[in-house]
């Protein structure tokens, strides 16, 4: 959609002598006080000429620019609010905070809840990875992390705050009066904005080739069919670039110098790259507006311009600018890494963790291309020291940040050992596509830049997309939200049936200890029953749905409830059989299986206790990645970058039991969503993000508070005690804890004791002697194993000395029949194939192990063997094959010869 001219023809512009002009280059309308101006003052229509503008403001650091902006709007009736984390954990569809408006999406922007204050001002650290491949090349125009300073106003039908006129006036006053930019240099470029399902006209504020702010007037909703419908809530959504404000006041040759100051020189030194020639940098920066990173020709033209201007050889210009760009990239990426990890990101292969790992690995790749020996954590440490006053959380979580970065570097270095093997596999393809490269990165974590050198050795050419990392990030930057209908275990026809039914009154919130109740039947469909009220808790938040009985008061017939589910606000009781005696309008009595429910309540409350204990022991980066509460046990999945030690598990358990024995009060609260976020932070959403204006919180006194809709005990003493019975790493960056509490703990102790008694009987000892007896048995087994190993070595030596190969056309083929286990065989086969042109095969019935020397291909042999039927495969120089039928040595040799 394109807005009409009238959308931008503001009284403010007319009264203040702004003229509407059309840019001679991009043909976009813009407003200016300079009647002679022909260009919109945005790149690439002009070069960066802000260096030549007389700006009255003293040079501002990022911190000073931020404070100047916030103070300006505070003095003009705006309330300053704290920024949110760079991880958008109040959103289920987005991993990173990409702009200040994300702080208020979707619940404020949809009108579900009011903003925390209105109007407001904030400086929100943001991360966008869509430009990650462009960082450094444009001298600071593109960054992955930046601060979006913003003032927001939310206009309701019955409450007007301010709109276009005032917003434009504020921008003009800030830039001309507060920063001292000459009035004739300020331009407002007409544009259109869309994002997050909303849209509206916007004005881009440009000065001297630099876009300093965007003023968005959010006033439309984009419907599913692409139409635009007016919003009742009209939102002023501005974004001022804090780093660009610092840049334009300092007039440094790059934005990196304005942002990082002396850290720029320190990074060049630590990385081991000579600092770029100052004159070259200044000239290159001035012409940088001409660079469109998506068009490689513009980069070439830019460097030719620099070469011509300075009379320097083009190759020297390219080499020096390439090196500098890489250092700038590392400056940018290490700050992004620091902020991500400080806010709790754990690098992994999925979700937000994937994006964090992507930035870390790109930084490591750049260091490798620069042939630098510096450890990445050393550079991140410099960032922490530099930003600790601006972002206190980076100092608080310093140990975790540095530990996680170093661990990621060690993992990356291990992965790089696979490069030759992966390159060999890719080299066999007739064409290497972008999709192939993305798949290799996703599966193995290997950047294509590092494959390039290996593939060149094999004379394989491929085109490396300039925006590779942006393409990968785009695939992983959002998450799919499941609707309420997708989340429940009910058939489609049942879901349609309940749409007309009124919400169910939730008695379990009024009294979590209520065991029975009376209710009126609102719906009966097959074996599904809906009442006007219930104390049956529906499955949710990892807690299983209640079971029990529904009793027909007319006939006294009892129906077993086998599960309880919820769709939106309607609760569905799932019966074991169709309730033939019950119809709509009847009164029934419900009785929950109290013993089962009470076990679930204990396991649910102790889950909150253990999560807070894990944070205390492991660090604030711990986040709930999943949970399940059953009558038998509880399960909690947490994000953490390492396997837990025995000592850490013991500490978590000890803290949890201490909280239980402290008899702490457990209290549910209901609060306005924004009020809860402002008071407790977004960590209240550990267990999920509810979609309501008022949210239910669970507070364990002086220990934990988070959003939770489950049922809980009222005091931690009711839990009794807890025992962590299993700890395992279920995926990269996620640890699973399993535990039992209350009666389930007693059951576990009984079962464990029974197993100890049974094990004692099997080995012929008493339970108290079990440990010492097992040690003796293990020692005996170890002695026998050592003896077996000695015998095997003797046999292996004899075999290697006496085994004669079949020699065909300069190739040697060794056949071994039925010797030892698979691992032993593999070792012998490797030794036999240590010289070129050698094949070794171990035969055991119809199972084959095949090895080849490095100059041969095992896959060709496998392919030929499987022509007669069977299955198998391998990679590199080793394979396993199972044939459909047993073959003789001679037949196998004949097949191998065919493959050569």
Curated annotation (Swiss-Prot):
Cystine pairs: none
GO biological process, one term: alanyl-tRNA aminoacylation
Locations listed in the record: Cytoplasm
GO molecular function (one): zinc ion binding
Superkingdom classification of source: Archaea
Keyword GTP-binding attached: no
Keywords: Aminoacyl-tRNA synthetase, ATP-binding, Cytoplasm, Ligase, Metal-binding, Nucleotide-binding, Protein biosynthesis, RNA-binding, tRNA-binding, Zinc
Gene3D superfamilies: 2.40.30.130, 3.30.54.20, Bira Bifunctional Protein, Domain 2, Threonyl-trna Synthetase, Chain A, domain 2
Pfam families listed in its UniProt record: tRNA-synt_2c (PF01411), tRNA_SAD (PF07973)
Cofactor(s) listed in the protein's UniProt record: Zn(2+)
InterPro entries linked to this entry: aa-tRNA-synth_II/BPL/LPL, Ala-tRNA-lgiase_IIc, Ala-tRNA-ligase_IIc_anticod-bd, Ala-tRNA-synth_IIc_core, Ala-tRNA-synth_IIc_N, Ala-tRNA_lgiase_arc, Ala-tRNA_ligase, Thr/Ala-tRNA-synth_IIc_edit
Binding site for Zn(2+): 604, 608, 708, 712
Gene Ontology CC, one term: cytoplasm
Reactions that this protein is recorded to catalyse: tRNA(Ala) + L-alanine + ATP = L-alanyl-tRNA(Ala) + AMP + diphosphate
Principal subcellular localization: cytoplasm
Domains as described in the record: Consists of three domains; the N-terminal catalytic domain, the editing domain and the C-terminal C-Ala domain. The editing domain removes incorrectly charged amino acids, while the C-Ala domain, along with tRNA(Ala), serves as a bridge to cooperatively bring together the editing and aminoacylation centers thus stimulating deacylation of misacylated tRNAs.
NCBIfam families xref list: A-tRNA_syn_arch, alaS
Functional note: Catalyzes the attachment of alanine to tRNA(Ala) in a two-step reaction: alanine is first activated by ATP to form Ala-AMP and then transferred to the acceptor end of tRNA(Ala). Also edits incorrectly charged Ser-tRNA(Ala) and Gly-tRNA(Ala) via its editing domain.
Family per similarity comment: Belongs to the class-II aminoacyl-tRNA synthetase family.
Name listed for the protein in its UniProt record: Alanine--tRNA ligase
Gene designation per UniProt: alaS
């Amino acid at each position: 959609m394109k807005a009409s001219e009238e959308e931008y023809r503001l009284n403010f512009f007319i009264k203040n002598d702004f003229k509407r002009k059309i840019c001679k280059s991009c043909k976009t309308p813009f407003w200016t006080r300079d009647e002679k101006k022909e260009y919109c003052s945005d790149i690439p229509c002009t070069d960066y000429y802000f260096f030549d503008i007389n700006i009255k403001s003293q040079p501002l650091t990022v911190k000073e620019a931020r404070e100047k902006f916030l103070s300006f709007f505070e003095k003009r009736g705006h309330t300053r609010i704290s920024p949110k984390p760079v991880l958008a954990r109040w959103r289920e569809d987005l991993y990173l905070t990409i702009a200040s408006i994300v702080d208020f999406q979707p619940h404020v922007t949809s009108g579900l809840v009011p903003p925390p204050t209105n109007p407001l001002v904030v400086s929100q650290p943001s991360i966008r990875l869509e430009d990650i491949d462009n960082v450094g090349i444009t001298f600071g125009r593109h960054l992955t992390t930046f601060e979006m300073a913003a003032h927001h106003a939310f206009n309701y039908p019955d409450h007007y705050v301010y709109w276009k006129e005032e917003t434009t006036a504020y921008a003009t006053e800030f830039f001309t009066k507060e920063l001292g930019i000459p009035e004739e240099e300020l331009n407002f470029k007409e544009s259109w904005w869309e994002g997050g399902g909303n849209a509206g006209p916007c004005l881009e504020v440009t000065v001297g080739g630099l876009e300093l702010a965007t003023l968005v007037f959010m006033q439309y909703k984009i419907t599913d069919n692409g139409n635009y419908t007016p919003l009742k809530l009209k939102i002023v959504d501005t974004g001022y670039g804090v780093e660009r404000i610092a840049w334009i006041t300092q007039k440094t040759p790059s934005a990196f110098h304005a942002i990082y100051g002396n850290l720029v020189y320190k990074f060049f030194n630590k990385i081991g790259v000579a600092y770029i020639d100052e004159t070259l940098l200044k000239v290159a920066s001035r012409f940088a507006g001409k660079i469109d990173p998506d068009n490689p020709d513009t980069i070439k033209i830019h460097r030719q311009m620099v070469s011509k201007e300075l009379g320097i050889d083009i190759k020297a210009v390219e080499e020096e600018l390439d090196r500098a760009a890489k250092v700038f990239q590392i400056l940018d990426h290490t700050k992004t890494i620091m902020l991500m990890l400080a806010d709790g990101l754990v690098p992994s292969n999925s979700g937000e963790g994937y994006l964090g790992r992507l930035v870390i690995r790109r930084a490591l790749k750049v260091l490798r291309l620069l042939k630098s020996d510096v450890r990445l954590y050393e550079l991140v440490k410099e960032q922490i020291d530099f930003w600790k006053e601006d972002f206190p959380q980076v100092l608080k979580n310093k140990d975790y940040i540095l530990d996680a970065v170093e661990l990621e570097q060690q993992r990356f270095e291990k992965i790089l050992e696979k490069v030759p093997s992966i390159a060999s596999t890719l080299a066999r393809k007739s064409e290497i596509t972008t999709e192939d490269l993305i798949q290799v990165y996703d599966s193995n974590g290997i950047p294509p830049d590092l494959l390039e050198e290996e593939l060149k050795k094999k004379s394989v050419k491929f085109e490396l997309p300039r925006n590779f990392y942006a393409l990968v990030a785009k695939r992983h930057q959002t998450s799919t939200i499941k609707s309420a209908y997708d989340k429940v275990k009910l058939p489609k026809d049942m879901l349609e049936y309940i749409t007309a039914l009124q919400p169910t009154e939730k008695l379990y919130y009024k009294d979590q200890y209520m065991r029975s109740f009376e209710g009126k039947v609102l719906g009966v469909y097959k074996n599904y029953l809906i009442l006007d009220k219930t104390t049956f808790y529906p499955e949710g938040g990892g807690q299983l749905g209640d079971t029990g009985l529904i009793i027909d008061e007319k006939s006294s017939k009892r129906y077993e409830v086998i599960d309880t589910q919820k769709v939106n606000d309607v609760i569905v009781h799932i019966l074991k059989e169709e309730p033939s005696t019950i119809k709509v309008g009847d009164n029934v009595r419900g009785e929950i299986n109290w013993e089962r429910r009470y076990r679930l309540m204990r396991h649910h409350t102790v889950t909150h206790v253990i999560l807070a204990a894990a944070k205390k022991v492991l660090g604030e980066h711990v986040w709930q990645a999943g949970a399940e509460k059953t009558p038998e046990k509880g399960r909690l999945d947490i994000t953490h970058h390492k396997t837990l030690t025995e000592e850490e598990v013991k500490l978590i358990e000890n803290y949890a039991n201490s909280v239980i024995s402290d008899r702490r009060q457990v209290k549910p609260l209901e609060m306005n969503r924004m009020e809860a976020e402002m008071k407790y932070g977004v960590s209240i959403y550990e267990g999920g993000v509810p979609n309501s204006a008022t949210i239910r919180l669970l507070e364990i006194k002086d220990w934990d508070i988070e959003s939770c809709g489950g049922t809980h005990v009222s005091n931690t003493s009711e839990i009794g005690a807890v025992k962590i019975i299993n700890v395992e790493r279920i995926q990269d960056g996620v640890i699973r804890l399993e535990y039992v509490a209350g009666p389930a703990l007693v059951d576990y102790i009984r079962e464990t004791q029974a197993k100890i008694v049974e094990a004692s009987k099997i080995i012929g000892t008493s339970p108290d002697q079990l440990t010492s007896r097992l040690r003796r048995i293990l020692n005996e087994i170890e002695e026998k194993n050592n003896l077996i190993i000695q015998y095997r070595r003797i046999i292996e030596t004899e075999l290697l000395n006496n085994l004669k190969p079949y020699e065909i056309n300069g190739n040697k083929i060794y056949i071994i029949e039925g010797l030892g286990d698979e691992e032993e065989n593999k070792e012998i086969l490797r030794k036999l194939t240590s010289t070129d042109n050698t094949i070794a095969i171990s035969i055991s019935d119809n199972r084959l192990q095949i090895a080849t020397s490095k100059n041969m291909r095992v896959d060709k042999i496998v392919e030929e063997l499987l022509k007669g039927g069977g299955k198998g495969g391998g990679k590199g120089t080793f394979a396993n094959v199972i044939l459909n039928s047993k073959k003789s040595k001679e037949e196998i040799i004949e097949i191998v010869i065919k493959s050569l």
